[in-house]
Amino acid sequence: MGLKITVHKIAMGDVEDPELYAAAPIMEFEKSAKGRWLTENSKQQMEYIVRPNPETYGWMVIIFAWLEEQDLTYYRLKWGE
């Protein structure tokens, strides 16, 4: 199944429909080299959650992926996270 890790965060302002406004940045992330690699190597489909961001009174989108230990090591070495 792999380990669930946070792979990307997107901060947004106070918008009326955060799911709608998050769509474009999520698609940009999925098209990046990091996003493509994670899509190919995640053991389950990546998922995201939208939460209130109390620091900015806006929203935070958090994207998760499931990686095996070997893939997680590669990910951390390649992207330094």
Per-segment meaning from a language model:
Residues 52-81:
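Short, compact, well-ordered microdomains
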Residues 1-60:
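Positively charged, low-complexity terminal tracts
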